Swiss-Prot record:
It is an enzyme of class 3 (hydrolase). The keyword Lipoprotein does not apply. It comes from Capra hircus. Keywords: Aspartyl protease, Glycoprotein, Hydrolase, Protease. Belongs to the peptidase A1 family. This is Pregnancy-associated glycoprotein 59. Its EC number is 3.4.23.-. Placenta. The gene is PAG59.
Length: 27
Protein backbone atom coordinates (compact mmCIF):
# COMPACT_ATOMS: atom_id res chain seq x y z
CA UNK A 1 0.00 0.00 0.00
CA UNK A 2 2.89 2.36 0.76
CA UNK A 3 4.25 2.03 -2.79
CA UNK A 4 0.77 2.62 -4.22
CA UNK A 5 0.35 5.76 -2.13
CA UNK A 6 3.76 6.96 -3.36
CA UNK A 7 3.08 6.11 -7.02
CA UNK A 8 -0.46 7.51 -7.27
CA UNK A 9 0.47 11.12 -6.31
CA UNK A 10 3.45 11.09 -8.70
CA UNK A 11 1.28 9.87 -11.58
CA UNK A 12 -1.43 12.36 -10.65
CA UNK A 13 1.06 15.25 -10.60
CA UNK A 14 2.55 14.17 -13.95
CA UNK A 15 -0.95 13.94 -15.44
CA UNK A 16 -1.88 17.36 -14.06
CA UNK A 17 1.34 18.87 -15.45
CA UNK A 18 0.68 17.26 -18.83
CA UNK A 19 -2.91 18.52 -18.86
CA UNK A 20 -1.74 21.99 -17.79
CA UNK A 21 0.85 22.07 -20.59
CA UNK A 22 -1.83 21.14 -23.12
CA UNK A 23 -4.20 23.79 -21.72
CA UNK A 24 -1.48 26.47 -21.85
CA UNK A 25 -0.35 25.34 -25.32
CA UNK A 26 -3.92 25.49 -26.63
CA UNK A 27 -5.21 29.09 -26.75
Amino acid sequence: RGSXLTTLPLRNIMDMLHMGXITIGTP
